[in-house]
């Protein structure tokens, strides 16, 4: 199994395809496996590298303080260990936070930036997302991991999605159950994500940027689109209708196409 030791821990990754490097960074409590549709499709044109962040999947899960800066350093260290000096970087949700941090801390390593179902953190974002987390906390109390994974995907996707796509739900739960996330690791990731705030820094990102948002995302509600428009006016923004937070699962083909078109434009 492919690992690289970065910042003193083992980071699991997979790569597929040839061409310009494309790094895929997933979100809170999501292993890299959930990029399965994008890996399969985008590896036809790019060298796709997907990693498990610290605290999830097959990467190490130290019970210590995490931060977006540290997780960005993990991703950058992985790229450097693979001999990659510059890559396109795509991040979903918390992975979007990490991707922003990479673009800000190591701009010379980022060719183009893709931010999916994410925001800039900070008090406004936390307040808008709080109803989702309150619902989640009430719904998962006392539940087993496989039940939690079904519940969170049901709550974060657009209404009716899991009923219409039961096979997608089953596959996502199965992939997550291969390496269930320990509670301490979830708390470490969640806490780190809650402290992220790029609102006063994001204007410094000058790489070509694609922002993809779901109209019905309960974690990063669509009101945050205006924040992006104000602070990243030169970014390309696409809003998916009838789509919630798990865009990589809800609109897999369209997401792959939009990423490909953006990178080839």
Where are the model-predicted features located?
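Gly/Ala-rich beta-loop-alpha elbow adjacent to hydrolase catalytic centers
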Residues: 91, 95, 99
């Amino acid at each position: 199994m492919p690992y690289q030791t970065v910042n003193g821990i083992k980071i699991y990754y997979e790569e597929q395809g040839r061409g310009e490097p494309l790094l895929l960074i997933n979100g809170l409590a999501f292993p890299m496996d959930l990029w399965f549709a994008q890996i399969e499709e985008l590896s036809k044109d790019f060298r796709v590298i997907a990693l498990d962040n610290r605290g999830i999947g097959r990467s190490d899960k130290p019970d210590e303080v995490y931060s977006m800066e540290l997780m960005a350093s993990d991703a950058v260290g992985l790229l450097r260990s693979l001999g990659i000096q510059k890559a396109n970087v795509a991040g979903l949700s918390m992975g979007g936070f990490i991707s922003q941090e990479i673009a800000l801390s190591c701009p010379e390593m980022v060719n183009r930036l893709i931010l999916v179902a994410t925001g800039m953190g900070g008090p406004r974002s936390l307040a808008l997302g709080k109803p989702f987390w309150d619902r989640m906390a009430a719904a998962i109390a006392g539940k087993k991991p496989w039940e939690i994974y079904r519940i969170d995907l049901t709550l974060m996707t657009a209404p009716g999605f899991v009923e219409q796509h039961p096979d997608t739900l089953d596959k996502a739960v199965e992939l997550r159950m291969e390496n269930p996330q320990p509670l301490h690791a979830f708390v470490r990731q969640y806490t780190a994500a809650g402290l992220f705030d790029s609102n006063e820094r994001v204007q410094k990102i000058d790489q070509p940027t694609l922002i993809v948002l779901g109209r019905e995302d309960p974690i990063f509600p669509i009101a945050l689109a205006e924040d992006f428009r104000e602070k990243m006016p030169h970014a390309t923004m696409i809003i998916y209708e009838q789509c919630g937070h798990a865009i990589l699962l809800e609109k897999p083909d369209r997401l792959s196409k939009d990423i490909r078109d953006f990178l080839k434009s």
